A protein has these predicted regions:
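Acidic beta-strand-loop-alpha-helix segment within the catalytic core
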Residues: 1-68, 117-138
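Oxyanion/phosphate-interacting regions
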Residues: 49-54, 69-138
Length: 138
């Protein structure tokens, strides 16, 4: 199984030789958001206490490119990662964008520079998580 973007507006998953167009979940609201997140020891317990709403929403483990790919497929609606390297995020940026997703750092900077990354299925969810992550985004 692998993921690819055909253009800046079209992304696919190829599984067992069959290509299927993918898209983020465009109908999701914050009320029923599915979140994959991991802090990998980067975010201390004291810092985690500053974002209790984010912690309560975490439902799925996070695995860099796989979690970002699941968002592009519509399986999860937000992915929150810390201390990503360029090689963690660069390959998936065109796929997520082509599937309709939003990417940035936690302080709303360009995700292509790596760092603490937020990927969301729509702008409303993205902005809500940026606000919730603000206490730890510096």
């Amino acid at each position: 199984k692998y993921y690819l973007n055909y253009s800046d507006k079209t992304a696919y998953v190829v599984d067992k030789g069959k290509r299927k167009k993918i898209s983020v979940n465009k109908k999701v609201s914050f009320k029923n958001v599915k979140v994959a997140a991991a802090f990998h020891g980067w975010l201390s317990l004291d810092k985690q206490k500053k974002i209790p709403k984010v912690l309560k929403l975490m439902q799925f483990p996070c695995s860099d490119a796989l979690s970002y790919s699941h968002l592009a497929e519509g399986r999860v609606d937000a992915v929150i990662q810390c201390s990503n390297k360029i090689w963690d995020i660069h390959p998936i940026i065109p796929i997520v964008k082509a599937a309709g997703g939003y990417l940035s750092t936690w302080n709303n900077k360009d995700a292509s520079n790596a760092g603490n990354i937020l990927v969301s299925s729509n702008k409303t969810i993205h902005n809500k998580f940026l606000k919730l992550l603000k206490p730890v985004s510096k």
